[in-house]
């Protein structure tokens, strides 16, 4: 397969991308034309903040061509349809895309993730992996594995914040505790909690896809839990409330999350950078004293017990 590569200005990139798709290309991506140079302009900001730069000044539009397509004809058609300067058709190039088994390649990038000696996150294509304790005879008898494939919802166990919350659940979760996972994503924390001995478990997310993903993943892992949107969350307190989101939403949600923790219950927060820990803890100070439970790769897990 081949890719058509063309540099253009910021104002032209969207219209050209749409027109290329209408002209029959298989996919379009837009990259920084100055990537890897001193002029490169990263778009990302800090977690929970808006990026300072919203678009690149010079864009590189990359279109994946169908087999046998005439790149010059497709480009001219797209430029005309978008009402752009015909001179834009000069200076394009082609690059070969090596054939690959994309499914196998993707799967190779997601292996089993050990959270501890006995707790593992295991993609479905590693169900019979002898390297994972508890998946084959004669392996660790008390091993717990959570079957989870990468999907539309956040949470595969690879991010430090997910790892931190899983580690807390394994080390500190009271047996039979009623638990709320707020911002559940894939449902990984709620599912882990159930497998680690939690009682009634409720998973909440603002994204309907995440709620459905949690339902599906719970079924795969043969655990019972409730998954819902925030408006459907019934009244009541929980012995454990865990929220792995970002620092700004955590601060905004402080009254609600703290209010959901029963007296003597635990609040576990992550999605917080080390330098953000104090300001997040301060947001919860009227209700709980939060402190850093553990740090991993610049991220922290905050924990507090409600008086």
UniProtKB/Swiss-Prot annotation:
Q: Where are the annotated coiled coils located?
A: none
Pfam family name, one: PrmA
Q: What EC number is given for this enzyme?
A: 2.1.1.-
CDD domains recorded for this chain? AdoMet_MTases (cd02440)
Question: Per UniProt, where does S-adenosyl-L-methionine bind?
Answer: 162, 183, 205, 244
Family membership, please give it: Belongs to the methyltransferase superfamily. PrmA family.
Which top EC class applies here? transferase
Q: Name one GO molecular function term.
A: protein-lysine N-methyltransferase activity
Q: Name one GO biological process term.
A: methylation
A GO cellular-component term linked to this record: cytosol
Annotated function: Methylates ribosomal protein L11.
Q: Does the keyword Ubl conjugation apply?
A: no
Q: Would the keyword Isomerase turn up in this protein's UniProt record? A: no
Catalysed reactions listed for this entry: L-lysyl-[protein] + 3 S-adenosyl-L-methionine = N(6),N(6),N(6)-trimethyl-L-lysyl-[protein] + 3 S-adenosyl-L-homocysteine + 3 H(+)
UniProt entry keywords in alphabetical sequence: Cytoplasm, Methyltransferase, S-adenosyl-L-methionine, Transferase
Task: Return the protein name.
Answer: Ribosomal protein L11 methyltransferase
* InterPro entries on file: Ribosomal_L11_MeTrfase_PrmA (IPR050078), Ribosomal_PrmA_MeTrfase (IPR004498), SAM-dependent_MTases_sf (IPR029063)
Gene field? prmA
Q: Where in the cell is it found?
A: Cytoplasm
């Amino acid at each position: 397969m081949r890719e058509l590569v063309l540099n253009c200005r910021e104002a032209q990139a969207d219209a050209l991308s749409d027109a290329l798709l209408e002209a029959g290309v298989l996919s379009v991506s837009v990259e920084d034309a100055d990537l890897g140079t001193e002029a490169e302009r990263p778009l990302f900001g800090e977690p929970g903040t808006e990026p300072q730069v919203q678009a690149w000044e010079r864009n590189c539009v990359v279109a994946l061509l169908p087999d046998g397509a005439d790149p010059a004809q497709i480009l001219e058609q797209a430029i005309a349809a978008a009402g752009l300067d015909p001179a834009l058709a000069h200076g394009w190039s082609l690059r070969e895309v090596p054939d690959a088994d994309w499914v196998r390649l993707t799967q190779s990038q997601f292996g089993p993730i050990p959270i501890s000696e006995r707790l593992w996150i295991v993609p479905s294509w590693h169900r019979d992996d002898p390297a994972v304790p508890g998946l084959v005879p004669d392996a660790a008898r008390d091993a717990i594995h959570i079957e989870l494939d990468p999907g539309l919802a956040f949470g595969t166990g690879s991010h430090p914040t997910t790892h931190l919350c899983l580690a807390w659940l394994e080390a500190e979760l009271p047996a039979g505790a009623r638990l709320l996972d707020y911002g559940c994503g894939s449902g990984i924390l709620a599912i882990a909690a159930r497998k680690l001995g939690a009682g009634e478990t409720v998973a909440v997310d603002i994204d309907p896809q995440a709620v459905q993903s949690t339902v599906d993943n719970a079924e795969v892992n043969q655990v019972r839990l409730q998954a819902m949107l925030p408006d459907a969350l019934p009244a009541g307190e929980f012995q454990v409330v865990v929220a792995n989101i970002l620092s700004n939403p955590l601060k905004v949600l402080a009254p609600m999350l703290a209010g959901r923790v029963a007296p003597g219950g635990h609040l576990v927060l992550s999605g917080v950078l080390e330098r953000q820990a104090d300001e997040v803890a301060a947001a919860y100070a009227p209700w709980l004293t939060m402190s850093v439970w553990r740090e991993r790769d610049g991220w922290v897990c905050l924990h507090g017990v409600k008086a």
